[in-house]
Amino acid sequence: MLSTSRSRIRALAVVGMAGVLAAIGGVTFQASATEVAAPAAVGADARRVAIPGIAPAIRPPAGSRPVGAYVVTSGTQTYTCAGGVFTGGSVPEARLIGTGGRVHHFKGPSWQSERDNSLITAKKTAESPRAGTIPELLLTVDTHTGAGTFADVAYVNRLLTSGGVAPAGPCTDGATAAVPYGAVYVFWTAQK
């Protein structure tokens, strides 16, 4: 059953998603990680729970609700050499899998649902550094296209990052380097 590398990666992604979803599924984000969970004002089965592990600098606004979480199954951050070094921003190219099916993440940064073709583009609002890897981010959505998975998304977190750091050392101007990375993306609606 898990005889191929692809099958093992999928199994690992599913296990990782289960953990992420257990941590954030059906909760409302609170501004302080020290707050005690309290019953929600709406819905008998809803709960307000502090979501641990999100640095204060990259938390979405209080009242934001998670609508989906996705794990990078294959991804790269591509850097272009300028002035003999790989500096500046990177261009993402990744495949994600999660609560709303499969998602393509690409330059923009943009995310497009492969299930319903809904599309969002966002801009970086804040970042939180992580040693030896690309930073965790909070992004604010600035464009929506289509109805569906991403129709109500207002914020995106890039969390639990690994890899993706620009290569060190000299390079030839114009050369590119695609560096593998991993992350969990959490999509949030704004408080209504």
Which functions belong to the PLM regions below?
Residues 1-34:
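Secretory targeting and sorting signals
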Residues 34-78, 85-192:
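Primary mode marks residue(s) on the alpha4-beta5-alpha5 output face of response regulator receiver
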